Amino acid sequence: MIPTPVIVTFANQKGGVGKTTLCVTFANYLVTKGVRVVVIDCDFQHSIMKCRKADIRKYGEQDMPYEVWAYEANDKAMITSLMEKLHNDPEIDVVLMDSPGSLKTEGLIPLFVNSDIIIVPFHYDLVTVPSTASFLMFVDRLKKAVGERMKARLFIIPNLNDGRIGKRSELVIWDNARDTFSNYGYVTAKIPKRADMERFSTMAALDMQATIVTPVFDKVYQSIFDTLQPIREKELKGIQLTENLNPKPKKKKKYDPNIVRTKSASLMRNI
């Protein structure tokens, strides 16, 4: 258990890189580890929420392994408030955010600033590589602009990789891209292009998904529980010590997750 939730955001401005599928498969992976997960669908298509509704019709709501909430990322104030409240929810270990692709989305800045980990999937092709490079530079500029408030670690995942594609000259470009991307974050092993990775379920991993993604997800899991968890525990002890030395006359109002679930349920009915 982690004292305060770790927020993991899946993001890239380039569509079609498997961002949403990886978000759900990572949720399914974490559940098998006994991690308390919440998935928040902020993508404009709300594909995860639509899948969850289909899974509920098929399996029943009581059997769902984790909650899925839907939010509109265009509402900057709502996203800012949500992120602040999530950091103080003791009932959650990891929050997975599926972010929208457009960098013009109002709520994207507070979402990134408050994330502990940002996972950036991409493909090795002549369109996705430069688009991903542009996105990584955007995140880097944001980190420099906000300073210590943004501590997100980046995991950059070569996703749906097809080793049969690419001329010799293009393979050189891919190698150079990997070297460049490593300046912004940790570039993981490749996830191969398989039919199993072209669909997903919010109930459990499908077919061979777990086998395909586990080597990559293990790295992210280790970052959360071998590195971030001890840091969070120290931070919590420091906060508790400060509160004991300087008791406040009034307690801060406790976050009620039911409020969030009510808003999410309202949005879910409209999808």
Question: What do the PLM-derived regions correspond to, one by one?
Answer:
Residues I2-T4, A11-Q13, V17, N28-T105, ...:
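P-loop/Walker-type NTP enzyme "switch/lid" segment
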Residues V39, M97, V120, I156-P158:
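Structural beta-sheet core signal
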Residues E106-L126:
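Inter-motif core of Ras-like GTPase G domains
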Residues T132-E148:
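Conserved C-terminal guanine-recognition region of P-loop GTPase G domains, centered on the G4
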Residues T21-L22:
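Hydrophobic positions on the alpha1 helix immediately C-terminal to the Walker A/P-loop
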Residues A210-G238:
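Histidine-centered active-site loop/cap adjacent to the catalytic His
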Residues L160-D207:
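Beta-strand-loop-alpha "switch" segments that mediate conformational coupling across diverse proteins
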